[in-house]
């Protein structure tokens, strides 16, 4: 599989390292975040992997979709444009897979959290809150993974209806509000924790990344899967689609 990497930051470099150790894949090109991108750049590639920033991703997306090459997107911070991106993918009859976090461990954590949120829903004595920790160089907060975790809690629980990213000094948190706290600390790769609390006990559902290798390896697995799906059924995919097929 020939891969073009868009973005040469920490994650792009980690993905390149994973690919360099593989006998089955190779890097076709590495494009800097500021590169002028046209559809022709991607000709000869089997898949594109994008780890850039919101503005670069949105600017480059039309050219990536027009290339006809399936696109794996790890760039976060564009959730408010999700419907627009889905429409662009459909209009181009393209294949795009997005995840705020491609780590298999994180996605297993998210599934576990969704089930825990569902199980506590009938029992009003349980409250739930989320916390994410990342290195001080991470610009967006809460993290894309934390926001996805919050969405899953809202979908599965029913008692929580809105997400609160920052607490105010002059009001209490309402019972239907789900707090998502963010910590930026040192060189933390990523830690996500769900706190489920009652008067009698506390349940923790957590995932801690030990390195970026899990994120990068998951992105390459996703690229392999998407390249195969592109031939069968173009569309907008997530890690849920990937896991559902692997578990079926």
UniProtKB/Swiss-Prot annotation:
Keyword field contains DNA-binding: no
EC nos: 1.17.1.8
Keywords (A to Z) from UniProt: Amino-acid biosynthesis, Cytoplasm, Diaminopimelate biosynthesis, Lysine biosynthesis, NAD, NADP, Oxidoreductase
Molecular function per GO: 4-hydroxy-tetrahydrodipicolinate reductase; NAD binding; NADP binding; oxidoreductase activity, acting on CH or CH2 groups, NAD or NADP as acceptor
Binding residues annotated for NAD(+), in chain numbering: 74-76, 99-102
Main localization category: cytoplasm
Annotated metabolic or biological route of this protein: Amino-acid biosynthesis; L-lysine biosynthesis via DAP pathway; (S)-tetrahydrodipicolinate from L-aspartate: step 4/4
Enzyme class: oxidoreductase
Active-site feature positions: 134, 138
Substrates-to-products reaction catalysed: (S)-2,3,4,5-tetrahydrodipicolinate + NAD(+) + H2O = (2S,4S)-4-hydroxy-2,3,4,5-tetrahydrodipicolinate + NADH + H(+); (S)-2,3,4,5-tetrahydrodipicolinate + NADP(+) + H2O = (2S,4S)-4-hydroxy-2,3,4,5-tetrahydrodipicolinate + NADPH + H(+)
InterPro entries the record matches: DapB_C (IPR022663), DapB_N (IPR000846), DHDPR_bac (IPR023940), NAD(P)-bd_dom_sf (IPR036291)
Example GO biological process: lysine biosynthetic process via diaminopimelate
Disulphide bonds in the chain: none
Gene Ontology cellular-component terms listed: cytosol
Binding residues for (S)-2,3,4,5-tetrahydrodipicolinate: 135, 144-145
Cellular compartment(s): Cytoplasm
Annotated family: Belongs to the DapB family.
Job description of the protein: Catalyzes the conversion of 4-hydroxy-tetrahydrodipicolinate (HTPA) to tetrahydrodipicolinate.
Name of the molecule in the record: 4-hydroxy-tetrahydrodipicolinate reductase
Taxonomic path: Bacteria, Pseudomonadati, Chlorobiota, Chlorobiia, Chlorobiales
């Amino acid at each position: 599989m020939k891969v073009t990497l868009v973005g040469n930051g920490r994650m792009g470099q980690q993905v390149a390292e994973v690919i360099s150790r593989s006998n089955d894949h190779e890097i076709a090109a590495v494009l800097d975040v500021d590169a002028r991108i046209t559809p022709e750049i991607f000709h000869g590639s089997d898949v594109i992997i994008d780890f850039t920033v919101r503005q670069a991703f949105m600017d480059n997306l039309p050219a990536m979709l027009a290339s006809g090459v399936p696109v794996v997107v790890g760039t976060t911070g564009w959730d408010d444009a999700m419907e627009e991106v889905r429409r662009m993918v459909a209009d181009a009859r393209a294949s795009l897979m997005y995840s705020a976090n491609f780590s298999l461990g994180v996605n297993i954590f998210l599934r576990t959290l969704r089930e825990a949120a569902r199980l506590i829903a009938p029992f009003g004595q349980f409250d739930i809150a989320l916390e994410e920790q990342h290195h001080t160089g991470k610009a967006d907060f809460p993290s894309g993974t934390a926001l996805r975790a919050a969405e899953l809690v809202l979908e599965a629980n029913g008692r929580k209806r809105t997400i609160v990213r920052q607490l105010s000094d002059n009001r209490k948190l309402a019972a239907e509000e789900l707090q998502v706290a963010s910590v930026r600390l040192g060189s933390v790769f990523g830690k996500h924790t769900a706190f489920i609390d009652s008067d009698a006990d506390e349940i923790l559902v957590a995932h801690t990344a030990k390195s970026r290798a899990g994120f990068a390896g998951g992105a390459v697995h996703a690229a392999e899967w998407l390249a195969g799906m592109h031939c069968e059924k173009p569309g907008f995919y997530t890690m849920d689609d990937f896991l559902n097929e692997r578990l079926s």
